[in-house]
């Protein structure tokens, strides 16, 4: 990520945004409705290296759950936000697919293309930060899930891998719950054909 940040910053020499923080703010975060105070990166600092304004994009980020969810929603829709293509579809597909390197890596994202998590659909991908902060995106389920909190504990005998507790405590239970909800859906009523709702009101079904 550090090398990628350097390359992107070098490519911005003649652009309106001179650093990656400004680029992300103007091209992504503001267009998807994330307030400036809801996110930060690189500990809020900028360093000059080789005459370039470098932001430490590989760490020091702070994002609210809502901000992360909006980014996940943007990626779910392959870079499209309310009809406007902010990122090219090809770029989104490339960075969220298996890059062919160890550890289920995409480019800045993690991919389930290899089936690392057997209970997750193969099109699932996720971003993660320190302390098991995670955003999971599953296009085939139209799913975006965000997890913020403390570091998750590994189970006894569990492989010493960063994503194992996330897989066991978040990914698998979440997908099992969704699949179970679909499987256990109640049949349609023979007596009620429709229930009219006022404009703007949505129905939330309890399938328990």
Please describe what each predicted stretch is.
Residues 1-2, 44-47, 68, 75, ...:
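Solvent-exposed loop/turn segments at secondary-structure junctions
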């Amino acid at each position: 990520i550090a090398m990628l940040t350097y390359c992107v910053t070098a490519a911005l020499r003649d652009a309106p945004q001179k650093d990656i923080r400004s680029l992300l703010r103007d091209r992504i975060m503001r267009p998807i409705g994330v307030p400036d105070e809801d996110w930060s990166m690189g500990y809020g600092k900028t360093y000059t290296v080789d005459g370039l304004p470098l932001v430490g994009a590989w760490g020091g980020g702070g994002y609210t759950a809502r901000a992360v969810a909006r980014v996940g929603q943007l990626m779910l829709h392959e870079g499209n936000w309310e009809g406007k293509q902010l990122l090219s579809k090809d770029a989104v597909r490339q960075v969220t697919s298996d890059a062919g390197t160890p550890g289920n890596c995409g480019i800045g994202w993690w991919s389930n293309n290899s089936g690392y998590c057997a209970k997750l659909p193969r099109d699932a991908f996720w971003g993660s930060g320190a302390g098991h902060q995670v955003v999971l995106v599953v296009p085939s389920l139209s799913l975006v899930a965000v997890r913020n909190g403390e570091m998750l504990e590994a189970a006894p005998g569990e492989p010493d891998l960063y994503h194992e507790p996330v897989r066991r405590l978040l990914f698998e239970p979440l997908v099992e719950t969704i699949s179970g909800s679909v499987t256990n859906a109640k049949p349609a009523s023979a007596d009620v054909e429709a229930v009219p709702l006022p404009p703007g009101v949505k129905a939330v079904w309890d399938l328990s």
